[in-house]
């Protein structure tokens, strides 16, 4: 019986061939060249896969095959007007079926021609846009890989985001490969920072919160050290911080005593319902901070404890001894990157802790390899599944249905409510959480003869308050 001939399953190769043979390939390439010139003229900043690819090109590497059609994702401090302007330019140059529509991600506008997407423009507040680090590749500004890391960590922090193509299925492998390339070609230098500590004691709920920030680092470091002792591995010599902690617990609360940097003595907790937790703990709000892009959620500050809100999200968590809930190492890495971006005066401190957390994961990986060689596959799988140092799908779930509905879903529901002209019942769990879609950007189609929408206001829509601004809370 004859066998079938071997087939070359080079997917990228055939994708390139398919692109070149599309009926409108010439028009698409011409439209993309218009987009490229627009990006350069407006000094917009590329991000996402194309920015990673271009940054790697500067180092002699890449993630995309040579000649692949560019997928232009860009940041703009005025993305709505820029998207409308780009649509007008394409239409005036004779391209057909030009349109600008609001994307599923509410802060993004998509531009298409002939039903092919040629540009995604995402909003970045001016205070961030004007200060983030960039590189230049062929006259195009691209976001620096240090900043790009944050977006890669994000998928690991919220594994069930973006249904029905949840990140755990659609992004984990791809983002891990991209992260490793960034770490290889653009490592963040280890610059030791002398830090003075003070011992702080906090009492927090046992079940509703995950320990975060510098306290989470202390817990993960000591958990690593206990694993080293269990494995009878020699003690490591390191310049990274080695804070200690102790605790005792009852059915409801944990009393935690932990070494905290004197410059940042407040405990940081992640919770899906910060206002209720603050009320239950008898604390008083002093300040509320808006999100910092997608990289830091709303923060509710009290005198000694800061609460990171994960409402409408399912945050990946780790469990350490006695089932103490700690954020995953990936969320901790994201926290330290956010700190470096948002507080330039202490950038070196946060990046030092970022590298320290990477070191913890590196050492944990070496210990897990040691355990794997000494145990059966079944025993190792059980052990690894409970390790706080591996990627996980264990999440801090909200007991209320409303806590797992994304902004995109709520906007879609608000659209349905508007079209039906029937309000949601007041008893509906989302009745108080529907956005005012009348303040969102409008779609625009230059060829339909209607005037371009004007006067979009970022200030009037809470969904665009993502610059990290903090406002004192009036009692």
From Swiss-Prot:
Disulfide bonds: none annotated. The keyword ATP-binding applies. It comes from the Viruses. GO terms for biological process: mRNA processing. Induction: Expressed in the late phase of the viral replicative cycle. It is found in: Virion. This is Putative poly(A) polymerase catalytic subunit. Its EC number is 2.7.7.19. Polymerase that creates the 3'-poly(A) tail of mRNA's. The keyword Transcription applies. One of its GO terms (cellular component) is virion component. Keywords: ATP-binding, Late protein, mRNA processing, Nucleotide-binding, Transcription, Transferase, Virion. It holds the Pfam family Poly_A_pol_cat. GO terms for molecular function: ATP binding; poly(A) RNA polymerase activity. It is an enzyme of class 2 (transferase). InterPro entries: PolyA_pol_cat_su. It catalyses: RNA(n) + ATP = RNA(n)-3'-adenine ribonucleotide + diphosphate. Belongs to the poxviridae poly(A) polymerase catalytic subunit family. Highly divergent.
């Amino acid at each position: 019986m004859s066998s079938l001939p071997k087939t070359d399953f080079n997917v990228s190769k055939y994708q390139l061939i398919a692109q070149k043979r599309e009926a409108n390939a010439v028009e698409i390439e011409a439209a993309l060249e218009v987009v490229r010139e627009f990006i350069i003229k407006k000094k917009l900043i590329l991000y996402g896969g194309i920015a990673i690819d271009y940054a790697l090109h500067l180092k002699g590497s890449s993630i995309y095959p040579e000649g692949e059609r560019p997928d232009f994702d860009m940041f703009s401090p005025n993305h709505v007007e820029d998207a409308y302007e780009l649509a007008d330019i394409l239409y005036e140059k004779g391209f057909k079926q030009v349109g600008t529509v609001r994307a599923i991600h509410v802060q993004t506008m998509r531009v298409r021609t002939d039903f092919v997407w040629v540009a995604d423009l995402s909003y970045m507040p001016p205070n961030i846009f004007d200060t983030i680090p960039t590189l230049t590749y062929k006259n195009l500004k691209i976001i620096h890989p240090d900043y790009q890391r944050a977006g890669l960590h994000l998928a690991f922090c919220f594994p069930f985001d973006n249904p029905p193509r949840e990140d755990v299925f659609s992004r984990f492998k791809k983002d891990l490969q991209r992260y490793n390339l960034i770490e290889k070609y653009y490592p963040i230098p280890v610059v030791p920072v002398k830090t003075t500590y003070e011992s702080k004691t906090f009492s927090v709920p046992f079940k509703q919160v995950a320990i975060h920030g510098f306290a989470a680092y202390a817990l993960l470091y000591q958990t690593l050290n206990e694993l080293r002792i269990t494995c009878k591995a020699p003690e490591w010599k390191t310049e990274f911080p080695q804070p200690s902690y102790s605790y005792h617990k009852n059915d409801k609360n944990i009393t935690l005593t932990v070494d905290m940097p004197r410059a940042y003595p407040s405990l940081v907790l992640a919770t899906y319902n910060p206002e209720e937790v603050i009320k239950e703990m008898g604390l008083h709000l002093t300040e509320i901070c808006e999100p910092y892009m997608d990289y830091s959620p709303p923060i509710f500050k009290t005198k000694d404890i800061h609460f990171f809100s994960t409402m409408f999200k399912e945050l990946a968590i780790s469990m350490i001894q006695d089932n103490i809930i700690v954020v995953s190492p990936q969320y901790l890495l994201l926290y330290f990157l956010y700190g470096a971006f948002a507080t330039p005066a202490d950038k070196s401190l946060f990046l030092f802790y970022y590298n320290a957390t990477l070191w913890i994961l590196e050492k944990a990986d070496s210990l897990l390899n040691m355990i794997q060689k000494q145990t059966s596959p079944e025993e190792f799988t059980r052990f690894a599944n409970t390790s706080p140092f591996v990627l996980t799908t264990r999440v801090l779930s909200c007991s209320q249905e409303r806590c797992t509905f994304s902004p995109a879903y709520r906007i879609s529901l608000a659209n349905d409510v508007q079209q039906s002209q029937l309000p949601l019942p007041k008893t509906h769990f989302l009745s108080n959480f529907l956005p005012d879609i009348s303040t969102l950007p409008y779609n625009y189609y230059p060829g339909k003869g209607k005037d371009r929408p004007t006067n979009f206001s970022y200030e009037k829509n809470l969904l665009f308050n993502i610059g990290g601004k903090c406002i004192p809370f009036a009692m």
